[in-house]
């Protein structure tokens, strides 16, 4: 038991050190940054290295092909309370469509509340908020029992307060994914995200004379991942390439390890999306095919290292 704990800690530290050298790029200035922060407690606890995973109600968000490999229906809900009045929430459901397909739907929201508004003289005039939403519809089809192809259709919205008006941008994008199950222990995954996604801003609704239509492109993200399952733990690793207009903006390595203490308790840690997380999952209710799991992760990122630890809580159920 002690040797297994040492191995778990050693791998966690190794993932942190290796990933730190490859995660120096900053893509926060590009649209959709809230989608690149991780969603549930399990996701951030594993460094968001879920390209080759097929486990939960938000499987399609990371790789739509994973929905075809789920044996049960899964639901997931999570919430992150971040520093600087930021928040991130998600809800998702994935359903198996017999005999060889799967479908999922998810909603992700990220926003900032209680922003101080000031007039041209610098005087306080109230508080405002801004937020982004993503609605994701996933579908996947499995072939020959080992290979699945999947597709996401996504609608993203972004609302910005300007004076007494609300400026809204809307984007429609597509994700394409592949998942290959080599055997019961090894899975490979690949996904291309944000194809054709770009916010369209119509400022002429606020500035009648000087307004225009402006497009803000999402970065296209290429991911490849592997998941390896052992007797009582599994290792997940992703490599990620972020591009914009065919130009490589940078690359990142995300990874995590998940250790099963028993059938009810799981420990995990990982580094990815410039966030280091460690946490656990506890299945506190089981009845036939129905089960409920509570997940928790403590996360540190580039912002939180000056403002304490982010606590991420999520719950998932299978039925």
List PLM regions with ranges.
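N-terminal glycine-rich anion-binding loops that anchor highly charged ligand groups
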Residues: 55
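Bacterial Sec-dependent signal peptides at the C-terminal "C-region" and cleavage site
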Residues: 19-25
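Bacterial N-terminal signal peptides
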Residues: 8-19
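Positively charged n-region of N-terminal signal peptides that target proteins for export
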Residues: 1-7, 145
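N-terminal periplasmic accessory domains that precede
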Residues: 58-69
């Amino acid at each position: 038991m002690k040797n297994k704990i040492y191995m778990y800690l050693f791998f966690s530290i190794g993932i942190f050190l290796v990933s730190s050298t490859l995660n120096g790029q900053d893509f926060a200035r590009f649209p959709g940054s809230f989608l690149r922060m991780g969603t549930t407690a399990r996701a951030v606890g594993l460094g968001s290295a879920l390209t080759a995973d097929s486990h939960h109600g938000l499987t399609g968000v990371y790789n739509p092909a994973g929905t075809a490999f789920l044996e049960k229906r899964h639901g997931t809900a999570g919430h992150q309370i971040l520093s600087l009045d930021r928040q991130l929430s998600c809800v998702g459901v994935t359903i198996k469509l017999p005999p060889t397909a799967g479908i999922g739907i998810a909603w992700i929201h990220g926003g900032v509340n209680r922003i101080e508004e000031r007039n041209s003289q610098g005087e306080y005039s109230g508080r405002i908020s801004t937020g982004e939403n993503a609605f994701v519809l996933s579908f996947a089809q499995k072939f020959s029992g080992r290979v699945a192809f999947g597709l996401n259709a996504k609608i993203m919205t972004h609302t910005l307060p300007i004076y007494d008006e609300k400026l809204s941008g809307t984007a429609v994008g597509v994700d394409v994914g592949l998942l290959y199950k080599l055997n019961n222990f090894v899975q490979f995954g690949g996904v291309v995200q944000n194809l054709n996604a770009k916010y369209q801003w119509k400022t002429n609704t606020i500035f009648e004379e000087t307004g225009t239509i402006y497009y803000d492109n999402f970065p296209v993200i290429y991911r490849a991942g592997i998941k390896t399952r052992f007797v009582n733990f599994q290792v997940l690793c992703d490599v990620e390439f972020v591009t914009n207009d065919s130009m490589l903006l940078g690359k990142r390595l995300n990874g995590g390890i998940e250790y099963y203490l028993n059938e009810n308790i799981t420990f995990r840690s990982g580094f990815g999306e410039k966030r280091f997380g460690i946490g656990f999952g506890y299945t506190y209710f089981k009845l036939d095919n129905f089960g409920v799991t509570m997940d928790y992760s403590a996360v540190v990122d580039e912002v939180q290292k000056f403002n304490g630890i982010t606590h991420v809580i999520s719950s998932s159920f299978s039925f």
